[in-house]
């Protein structure tokens, strides 16, 4: 294989070289173009690991609009719910760029859990992280004010980074989808934050100048 997916995904980081080699033997590598849907309600259950490129995972609202759940990069994975026989009624994973992905079938993965039980614990940890992120997103969307959604999002990035300068991990259009608004509204809000001397922005890098006043701006 050109890529060792076990070397980049946190799910397998605690395994020894022999165990990783055994897993690599079960994976199938694919080169896929931008805009390829890799997981949908109609696809067979499999674990999908990103070896190169970026993916987006989203669900469709009743009006057909995408609600972005997360952007996946190298080392991230999707599809674990289907491996545990949990139905997928409305979740899609699609490539944002040309990408290299590795897949493991549900049958092979279930056998893997029996042979390498420590993966189960790591799977629980990683899934808890994903659930926490979804709960945080629900908190953003639960507020009617885009000021609150965007400022709290930026302040949460600051907390996670442990510093005032943060990098938004997705395109601004994707962030708008993630926060349930439009790119124009995000742009206007960022401009207001800059005019109020609360942030400085260069591309996707944002420096938070006054976190306390940003909290006040949110309200």
UniProtKB/Swiss-Prot annotation:
One of its GO terms (molecular function) is DNA binding. This is Probable transcriptional regulator flp. InterPro entries: cNMP-bd_dom (IPR000595), cNMP-bd_dom_sf (IPR018490), Env_Response_Regulators (IPR050397), HTH_CRP (IPR012318), RmlC-like_jellyroll (IPR014710), Tscrpt_reg_HTH_Crp-type_CS (IPR018335), WH-like_DNA-bd_sf (IPR036388), WH_DNA-bd_sf (IPR036390). Keywords: DNA-binding, Transcription, Transcription regulation. Residues 191-210 bind DNA. It comes from Lacticaseibacillus casei (Lactobacillus casei). SUPFAM superfamilies: cAMP-binding domain-like, Winged helix' DNA-binding domain. GO terms for cellular component: cytosol. The keyword Protein biosynthesis does not apply. Residues 144-212 form the HTH crp-type domain. Transmembrane segments: none annotated. CDD domains: CAP_ED, HTH_CRP. The gene is flp.
């Amino acid at each position: 294989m050109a890529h060792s997916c076990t070397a980049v995904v946190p799910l397998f980081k605690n395994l020894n070289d022999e165990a990783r080699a055994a897993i690599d033997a079960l994976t199938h590598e694919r080169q896929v173009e931008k805009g390829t849907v890799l997981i949908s309600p109609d696809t067979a259950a499999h674990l999908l690991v990103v070896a190169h490129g970026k993916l987006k995972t989203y669900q469709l609202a009743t009006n057909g609009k995408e609600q972005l759940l997360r952007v996946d990069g190298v080392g991230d994975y999707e599809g674990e719910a289907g491996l545990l026989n949990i139905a997928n009624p409305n979740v899609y994973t699609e490539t944002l760029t040309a990408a290299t992905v590795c897949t493991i079938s549900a049958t092979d993965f279930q056998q893997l859990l029996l042979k390498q039980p420590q993966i189960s614990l790591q799977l629980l940890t990683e899934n808890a992280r994903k659930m926490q992120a979804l709960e945080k997103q629900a908190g953003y969307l639960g507020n009617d004010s885009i000021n609150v959604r965007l400022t709290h999002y930026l302040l949460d990035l600051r907390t996670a980074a442990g510093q005032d300068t943060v990098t938004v991990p997705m395109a601004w259009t994707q962030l708008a989808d993630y926060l349930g608004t439009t790119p124009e509204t995000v742009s206007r809000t960022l401009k207001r934050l800059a005019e109020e001397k609360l942030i400085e922005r260069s591309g996707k890098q944002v420096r938070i100048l006054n976190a306390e006043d940003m909290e006040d701006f949110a309200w």
